[in-house]
Amino acid sequence: MPGLIIDKDDVCFYVTEKCNSNCIMCPMSLDSRKRGNHMNAEEWKSFEESIPGNVSHITITGGEPFLCYERLLPTLKRINLRYPNADILILTNGRALAVSRIMDQLKPLITDRYCFAIPIHGPNEDLHDKITSSPGSFRESITALHQLTDTPARVEVRIVGHKLNLDRINDTLHLLCTLHSRIDVINLIAMEMTGCAARNREFLWVDYDVLCQTAEKGIQYAIMHGIDVGLYNFPLCQVPERLWPLVKHSITPSKIMYSDDCAMCSCRDACGGMFYSTRLLKLCVVKPFGKGE
């Protein structure tokens, strides 16, 4: 449900369940994306006013937050005034940023404290639009990356890895390197196995180690081009040790689960674990490191 999650000086403002894409591996259900809730005006105002004064990081997410752009844009203006030192991360598919009337209103609000995280699912329109089930979405998301070039914002691209795009992961990374001046960070993301991802797991799931090994050439290529690369949602035992510096503790603490076998692992404290849903579906066999390793 839409709402506000406060964790010390970190806030997540979840503004809507609805989305204008229909990604096959979305961790939300189709029903929530198509018939879910926007906040009403009273709820929105109440949650916005509940953001604490000492906040250092604000994440705005959905669904697709720019489906609520008429409320979101004034909120961003107020956030800029009230929390000038807070970093703002906006998780968006970017499609609305290809619309001139929205982008023209958004651009004056963007400061160097902003970061936009936009998913790109493949190196071309055919694959990306197949995954989003939304014709034209690739063109719109790429347009968003170009539009953000003229702003002081940082730009992050997220690639969610699965069987449908596994063979084109390196091509996707190469494409993003051609947009180097527009991209600061690329994060390769392992799926959260809930919602549509869980329902479609038989033809989506790919083992963590296979995903890492397949993408490694493209990852190294991106790093050589000066782009920061991160690995999200990967247990350390599934990642080649040479890529460990890229692994992020990215899973919300309430969603993390460790296998019983992880208790004996010498690297447990350094590992971000796996999603509870992944463990529940028995999709990963962990490989604990011995105390002497």
Task: Explain the meaning of each model-derived region.
Residues 73-80, 116, 166-184, 240-256:
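Short, electropositive alpha-helical surface patch
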Residues 54-60, 83, 89, 114-115, ...:
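Conserved C-terminal portion of the radical SAM core fold
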Residues 1-12, 53-54, 242-250:
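N-terminal [4Fe-4S]-dependent radical SAM core
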Residues 29-35, 130-136, 201-207:
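Short glycine-enriched, charge-decorated loop/helix-capping segments at active-site entrances
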Residues 2-43, 268-274:
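Canonical Radical SAM [4Fe-4S] cluster-binding loop centered on the CxxxCxxC motif
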Residues 240-293:
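Flexible mid-to-C-terminal extensions adjoining Fe-S/redox cofactors in radical SAM and related proteins
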Residues 33-46, 65-110, 120-126, 134-140, ...:
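Canonical radical SAM enzyme core domain
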